[in-house]
């Protein structure tokens, strides 16, 4: 099977991650997945949401948005509408959950790391790109806490990355572009850690149903893609990559609280 952009079924689009893309943020990255491009910045706020005050641990949250002309037709800015849309709220909650899964929250103290993920060009896979690029920005932001003596070790327990898989014309395919995503019979978004544990699996049949065997082969394909993405995260983080996971013995803070943003 030759896909709409010439790739093989198990082939990802070219992925590039540019670290330190924003000179002001504690951590930042530009991630390019094919023609999808997302700027991710991580900022540290020395306070936590009300529900965590006095708990002695931190929080990781995210905001997600798209530039008006990130797509073929100009969209209205959500700031003009006065509130984020339902899709943006769903995506930013997914990003927050995914990143919290690999953070030692007690080691943060009562601090919040805020990820801003802004899509400057969309061609499918914006939410999965935001998670993968957001992780790199998160790690650099966390390193500032080590540099400042807030914590002796990087409070990141594992890698996390995400990709999409789906059934397109009956074939299992990896990393769907927009044209494939729009026409796929089944579409999954998969988030996994570097040690191979699932954080989230979102799967939908678009006008059709699917079997357990389809789920298995789609997840197997997602594992291949996410392993590749984690290797790229390792490469771009350089020497800092070796610090990730050194706190893995203390995972009590890695779980999220409820489904707040």
Swiss-Prot record:
Write down the top EC class of this protein.
transferase
Q: Name the family.
A: Belongs to the RNase PH family.
Q: What is its EC number?
A: 2.7.7.56
**Keyword vocabulary terms for this entry:** Nucleotidyltransferase, RNA-binding, rRNA processing, Transferase, tRNA processing, tRNA-binding
Protein name, entry field: Ribonuclease PH
How this chain assembles, per its entry, is: Homohexameric ring arranged as a trimer of dimers.
Disulfide bond positions? none
- What is this enzyme's catalytic activity, as reactions? tRNA(n+1) + phosphate = tRNA(n) + a ribonucleoside 5'-diphosphate
Keyword tRNA processing listed: yes
Q: Which InterPro entries match?
A: ExoRNase_PH_dom1 (IPR001247), ExoRNase_PH_dom2 (IPR015847), ExoRNase_PH_dom2_sf (IPR036345), PNPase/RNase_PH_dom_sf (IPR027408), Ribosomal_Su5_D2-typ_SF (IPR020568), RNase_PH (IPR050080), RNase_PH_bac-type (IPR002381), RNase_PH_CS (IPR018336)
SUPFAM superfamilies on file:
Ribonuclease PH domain 2-like, Ribosomal protein S5 domain 2-like
Q: Give the top-rank taxon of the lineage listed in the UniProt record for this protein.
A: Bacteria
Q: Which PROSITE patterns match?
A: RIBONUCLEASE_PH
Q: Which GO terms of the molecular function aspect are on file?
A: 3'-5'-RNA exonuclease activity; tRNA binding; tRNA nucleotidyltransferase activity
So where does phosphate get bound? 87, 125-127
Question: Which BP terms from GO are recorded?
Answer: rRNA catabolic process; rRNA processing; tRNA processing
Q: What function is annotated for this protein?
A: Phosphorolytic 3'-5' exoribonuclease that plays an important role in tRNA 3'-end maturation. Removes nucleotide residues following the 3'-CCA terminus of tRNAs; can also add nucleotides to the ends of RNA molecules by using nucleoside diphosphates as substrates, but this may not be physiologically important. Probably plays a role in initiation of 16S rRNA degradation (leading to ribosome degradation) during starvation.
User: Pfam families attached here?
Assistant: RNase_PH (PF01138), RNase_PH_C (PF03725)
- The keyword Ligase is assigned to this record: no
């Amino acid at each position: 099977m030759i896909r709409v952009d010439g790739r093989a079924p198990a082939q990802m689009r070219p992925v590039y991650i540019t670290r330190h893309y924003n000179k002001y943020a504690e951590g930042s990255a530009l991630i390019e997945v094919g023609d999808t491009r997302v700027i991710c910045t991580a900022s540290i706020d020395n306070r936590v949401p009300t529900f965590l005050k006095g708990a002695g641990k931190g929080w990781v949250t995210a905001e997600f948005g798209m530039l008006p002309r990130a797509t073929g037709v100009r969209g209205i800015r959500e700031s003009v509408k006065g509130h984020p849309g339902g899709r943006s709220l769903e995506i930013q909650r997914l990003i927050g959950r995914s990143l919290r899964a690999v953070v030692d929250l007690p080691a943060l103290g009562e601090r919040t790391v805020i990820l801003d993920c802004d899509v400057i060009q969309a061609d499918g896979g914006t939410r999965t790109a935001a998670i993968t690029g957001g992780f790199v920005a998160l790690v650099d932001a966390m390193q500032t806490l080590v540099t400042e003596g807030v914590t002796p070790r990087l409070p990141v327990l594992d890698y996390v990355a995400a990709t999409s898989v789906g059934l397109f014309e009956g074939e299992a395919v990896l990393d769907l572009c927009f044209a494939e995503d729009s026409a796929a019979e089944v579409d999954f978004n998969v988030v996994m850690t570097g040690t191979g544990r699932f954080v989230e699996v979102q799967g939908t049949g678009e006008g059709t149903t699917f079997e357990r065997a389809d789920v298995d082969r789609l997840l197997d394909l997602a594992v291949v893609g996410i392993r590749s993405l984690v290797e790229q995260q390792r490469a771009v983080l350089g020497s800092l990559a070796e610090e990730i996971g050194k706190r893995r013995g203390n995972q009590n803070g890695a779980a999220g609280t409820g489904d707040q943003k």
